[in-house]
Amino acid sequence: MEEAETDATENKRASEAKRASAMLPPPPPPISPPALIPAPAAGEEGPASLAQAGAPGCSRSRPPELEPERSLGRLRGRFEDYDEELEEDEEMEEEEEEEEEMSHFSLRLESGRADSEDEEERLINLVELTPYILCSICKGYLIDATTITECLHTFCKSCIVRHFYYSNRCPKCNIVVHQTQPLYNIRLDRQLQDIVYKLVVNLEEREKKQMHDFYKERGLEVPKPAVPQPVPASKGRTKKALESVFRIPPELDVSLLLEFIGANEDTGHFKPLEKKFVRVSGEATIGHVEKFLRRKMGLDPACQVDIICGDHLLERYQTLREIRRAIGDTAMQDGLLVLHYGLVVSPLKIT
C-alpha cells in the first residue's frame, strides 16, 4: 500500500511539472554568425536584405536581445539630462549669491553718499578746506597767493612782503628763507589762487571792487590786468635777454655774517645792528664794511671799528674776495664769510 501511494505521488508531481513546462514560452532560436552566401547568378533572386531581416537601423522592431541596450541608453540619457540640470541650478545659485553681495556693497556705498541718488560726488563742507586757503598772517582768505620756495608755505602777497621787511624767516615754521634777500625765494601760486576763488563765492568780485574803490578814493589810476605779451620771433635773443636780467653778476657773490664781540665803556651810546646778514660785492673792501656799520649803528666819529676774520685783524684796503681766498674755509660758516667787529675809543681822542 505504501509503495502504491508513493508511486501515485511521484506521478502527480511529474504531471504538474509537465503542465508547468508546457505553459513556459519556447526559447528563442540560437543566433548563428552570418554565412558567406555566394552572389546569385544572373536571373536569380538573392537572399533577403538586412533591412528585410529586421537588422539594426531598419524600420521594423529590433530583436529581443538588443532591447536591454536600448533601455540602458535611455537611462544614461536621463542621467545626463539630470546632471545638466544640476549644473544649471548651481550656476544660478552662484549668480544669485554674487547679486546679493553686490547689492550689500551698493547699499554700503549709498549709505555714505549724499541724500540725492543722482549725485555721485561726495559734498565737502567749506569748513574742512578753510585751513588750506587761509593766510596765517592776516587770518583771511588768500589774495595773490604767494608761496615760499624753501618750505612751501603760502601767504597773501602783501602780508609776506610786509613781513620780510623786518624778518627773513617764515612766519609759520621759522625757517630762514634767505640770509639777505628773502624776497628772492617767493613765487606767486596762480593755481592755488584760482582754487580759492572757485571755493569762496564772490571773493574775486569783492576783491576787485575793493581795489577799484581804493585807487578811486585816492585819485590814482586803477592798474590794468596784466596781458601776456606776444612771443617775439627770435627765441635765442629773448633767452639771452632773460638770462641777463635774472642772472646774478659774478661780483655779487659774497654774503657776510657780522658778529658783534663787544665795545669799550668810553664808546658812548650806539644802536645795535638789526640785520647781521649782508650780501655785498666781492670787490668791496673792509673800509666799505666799516662805513656800513657806522651808518647803521650811528657811531661817533671818534669811535674806532676793528674788524676781525678768524685770528686776523683786517686792513681797510683788503677786499672781501681776497680775504676769503687767503683765509679759506676756516672763515666760512654755511656759505657765509664770518666777520667779527668790536668798538674801541680812538687813540687820538685820548691824547
From Swiss-Prot:
Residues 38-51 have a biased composition (Low complexity). GO terms for cellular component: nucleus; PcG protein complex; PRC1 complex. Residues 81-101 have a biased composition (Acidic residues). A zinc finger (RING-type) spans 135-174. Gene3D superfamilies: Phosphatidylinositol 3-kinase Catalytic Subunit, Chain A, domain 1, Zinc/RING finger domain, C3HC4 (zinc finger). Keywords: Coiled coil, Isopeptide bond, Metal-binding, Nucleus, Phosphoprotein, Repressor, Transcription, Transcription regulation, Ubl conjugation, Zinc, Zinc-finger. Transcriptional repressor. May modulate the levels of histone H3K4Me3 by activating KDM5D histone demethylase. Component of a Polycomb group (PcG) multiprotein PRC1-like complex, a complex class required to maintain the transcriptionally repressive state of many genes, including Hox genes, throughout development. PcG PRC1 complex acts via chromatin remodeling and modification of histones; it mediates monoubiquitination of histone H2A 'Lys-119', rendering chromatin heritably changed in its expressibility. Within the PRC1-like complex, regulates RNF2 ubiquitin ligase activity. This is Polycomb group RING finger protein 6.
